[in-house]
Amino acid sequence: MKFSFSFMPKDEKFFFLLHQSAINIHQVAMSLQDLMQNFENVSAKVGEIKELEEFGDQIIHNITQSLHTTFVTPIDREDILALAGRLDDVIDAIDEAAQYTLAYKIEEPTEFARHLSTIIVSCADQLERAMGMLSTRSSKLREILPLSVEINRLENEADQVLSLAMGDLFTDGTDVVHILKWRDIYNTLEEATDRAEDAANVLEGIVLKHS
């Protein structure tokens, strides 16, 4: 997929691309949740997530290329790069977790994995809403802040789920391979929420600079 933004104002071009990245995160998160809730056609579903991850890489490439050809940016270029990078990190973590389910030949996701995937969708929803508001001006920009706070809360919830999951994992049996597989999956799912929190923190900094 290619973007047609040649005739967009420079302000709108960057906001459009960042919003597209957040929309893509939401799509990837929903695909992950579907994988965890309906664990069938796993190879096809993981492949779909990989395609969305590659599309996300294209968005980030477009942002980087646009920065090289734009003298004046609507917000600091360092903030644009940081935000784009953190958004890309969210997708990378989701894709990695999905790839693990295929590579490790997981028979069925656990309730902990399903719970974490639901939290990731909630984080993605908040990010998409926040990125859609980024182009607003003045005091309205501050409406992003409650969304950032909610992402931080969700990340804390994911930490708690991870702690419970790891505790259950190490008391449920002595199958070392099983433990190692699920340790990787749990940690990577939780990492997606960490990266969402990183993006929220960058957003918060942008809001405080420009509102």
Predicted segments, located by residue:
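Cytosolic, long alpha-helical scaffolding segments
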Residues: 1-211
